Each structure stands twice: as C-alpha cells, then as structure tokens.
Amino acid sequence: MHLSTSAAAILALSLAGPTMAGRPYFCPLALDAKFLQVPYCCEGFVPARDSKVSFEGVNCIDVSSDEDFVKTCPKGGTPKCCYSIGPKVICTTEVGDGVDK
C-alpha cells in the first residue's frame, strides 16, 4: 500500500494529535521531510546537507519534556523545532505557542 504525501501527513497528525494536547509549545511537521519535531536548545547551527530549509544543530538538548517549559534556552537563544536522525539533530522551524496545561 502506498500513501500519498498528504495522506501520510494526515495520518501522522491524527496519531500524534492526542499526545500533543496540553503542551505549552507547538512544533509543526518538519519542512524538509515531514517528520514530527520537538523543541531543542542548540549552541549553534550549520546548514544541513542537501537542504535549503533545514539546519543541523550543534550540541543540542531536547527540552520537550522539561516540566517548566520556557522559551529561552539555558545558554541564550530560543528553542527550535527539530527532529533527530541518529546522532544528528535537524531543525526547520521556530517553536510556536501551544496549549498551557
């Protein structure tokens, strides 16, 4: 069975929707690959290989599970919406406002 890109995106959102309820942040699907993203704080960014819309994060930490989520990273800057592939963290968008708990 082969799903179209839009059907796959709708399926991903329907499966992830209940888990996103009540989060103080919002991360859309990745702009380059339509993966689910979560907030990461990174010390820096370099252009991702073969992409015009994404960046590879440098020394990143996942802050999605922080009890008191804040929009400021420990070393300054703001969290970015990213996904991980192996040891790499790929970021494509800014973190948006979610639903407060």
From Swiss-Prot:
It comes from the Eukaryota. This is Unclassified hydrophobin dewD. Keywords: Conidiation, Disulfide bond, Secreted, Signal, Sporulation. It is found in: Secreted; Spore wall. Residues 1-21 form the signal peptide. The lineage of its organism: Eukaryota, Fungi, Dikarya, Ascomycota, Pezizomycotina. Disulfide bonds join 27-81, 41-73, 42-60, 82-91. The gene is dewD. Aerial growth, conidiation, and dispersal of filamentous fungi in the environment rely upon a capability of their secreting small amphipathic proteins called hydrophobins (HPBs) with low sequence identity. Class I can self-assemble into an outermost layer of rodlet bundles on aerial cell surfaces, conferring cellular hydrophobicity that supports fungal growth, development and dispersal; whereas Class II form highly ordered films at water-air interfaces through intermolecular interactions but contribute nothing to the rodlet structure. Self-assembles to form functional amyloid fibrils called rodlets. Self-assembly into fibrillar rodlets occurs spontaneously at hydrophobic:hydrophilic interfaces and the rodlets further associate laterally to form amphipathic monolayers. Induction: Expressed after 12 to 24 hours post induction of asexual development, which correlates with the development of metulae and phialides. Expressed in vegetative hyphae. It comes from Emericella nidulans (strain FGSC A4 / ATCC 38163 / CBS 112.46 / NRRL 194 / M139) (Aspergillus nidulans).
